[in-house]
Each structure stands twice: as structure tokens, then as C-alpha cells.
Amino acid sequence: MTKVGVAGYGVIGQRLADGVAAQGDMELVGVADVAPTLPVRALAERGMPYNLFTAMPEKKNLLTDAGIPVSGTLEELVEEADIMLDATSAGIGAKNKEIYLKHNTKAVFQGGEKNDVADVFFHGYANYEKGVGADYLKLTSCNTTGLIRAIDAIDRAVGVPKTAMTIIRRVADPGDYHRGLTNALKMEHAPSHQAVD
């Protein structure tokens, strides 16, 4: 059974943890976060179905003072896991990679990280074979993932030499007020990171 850890228990991390916990061939060792955010508080209110590890030991008191039990540190989670799913904010995954390397733990990074964090810039539909056997994968962003599925399917059928598109998306997920207007639309500068991806 593959032992999996999740770093970052936000919008993406919650989905990853729930997905891993539902698999018959995986064991969720735990999730790591830094503060008693809304998802972490909800985890506690659900009776802690997943072990919570502090990503910043020096700030463990933020969690314990809020009455949230802590099972250990991010490094202890990494030591126990075979693979880490890193859903932390952009740039944090690259810092976490140092811990993953130290413990020879494989990792999959979310789309906000820079491409050089991983061996393969990975999309399960378009280049699955390149990811097989790699130790570190970086996933495309959620918007890019959807675009790649559609464009790749058409490309395989009839060929797509070039695409031009406009992406209209919300600025931030509910609860992520620090990223900007929640549930609002914003026109991005061109090219966006989706174009580069």
C-alpha cells in the first residue's frame, strides 16, 4: 500500500486528501498546514479524520491554541510517506522539495510552482508516459488541465497547429481573500501562464 502525505490543506489539498483516503491501494498518512484556517478548523470539527502535521514547528501553537491536535511536523510526515502531494501556495513547494529530497520521498507539485521544481511538467492525458518513473512531477494548473484535454483530443483527431483563446476565470477561491476579489472576474495580461503551459 502506498503511503501518501498532503502538504497544504486548502481548496486543492482537501480534495487530494479525500481522494487518497477513498483509494483502496493508498493510505493517507496525514495532511500538513501552518495555521487554523477554515479547512483546518473544519477538519477538527469533523473529529480529525486525518492526522494533521504542522508545516512550521515554530508556529505549532497557532494550531494547538485553537484546540486543534497536531500529530507531528511536516518533516515527520515526509519521513513516513512514500510520496507527497504538495498543494501549498506557489513557491512553498520548492522549499518543501528540500525536505522531500532529504528523505528520498517522491512528490507531485500543484500548478502554481515553477516548472523547474520537477523532472516532468505533467498532464495525465497529454504526456502520461513521460511521468512514469519520474520522482518529481509538476501538474498543469486547473485551467490549463481543462484546455489541454480539449485541445489534445482535437489535435489527435484532426491536428491543431495553433490555438488562440480568451480565458475568463475568477480571481480567487472563496476564503482566499488575500489573493484578491473573491468570486470576481479579472482580465489577465497576455500571455498568461496558461499560454506558456
Predicted regions and their residues:
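N-terminal Rossmann-like NAD(P) cofactor-binding subdomain of oxidoreductases
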Residues: 1-171
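Catalytic core of tubulin tyrosine ligase-like
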Residues: 160-197
